[in-house]
A protein has these predicted regions:
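Conserved short histidine dyad/triad with adjacent acidic residue
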Residues: 44-59, 93
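Histidine-centered metal-chelating micro-motifs
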Residues: 53-55, 73, 89, 93-99
Length: 119
């Protein structure tokens, strides 16, 4: 692990426009990862445009989420949960989930996953 730590601003990190089946209007920034000294973990920031969404999917790793701004829903195991700035969630490994921005507002959320979960 880095001795110095990391302090930065999201606006200084390049946005990767996500593409693929079930992805609409999603950008990703990798804020902290093993490259910055956080071995085994990755903290990403996702920006979902109004009406956009991540794919409905599951995977073999958990993730922790915190909503930085905006509004939307998190679908987990067949139920939609409202999200707004300050909301947080833990999605266990293997649980089907999807983030959706409101039709009239974007959604920005932090997602922390094990290193192998960042793709």
């Amino acid at each position: 692990m880095s001795e110095a730590g990391v302090v930065g601003n999201k606006d200084d990190v390049a946005v990767v426009v996500m593409s693929g089946e079930g992805i609409v209007e999603v950008g990703k920034r990798v804020l902290v990862s093993p490259a910055e000294g956080w071995d085994g973990w990755v903290m990403r920031l996702f920006d979902v445009g109004p009406g956009g969404h991540t794919p409905r999917h599951s995977h073999p790793w958990p993730h922790i989420n915190f909503v930085a701004s905006g509004r939307g829903t998190l679908f987990v195991d067949g139920a939609d949960h409202p999200l707004e700035a300050g909301s947080y969630a833990y999605v266990p490994a293997g649980h089907e989930h999807q983030f959706r921005a409101a039709m009239d507002a974007p959604l920005s959320f932090v997602c922390i996953v094990p290193e192998g979960g960042d793709y």
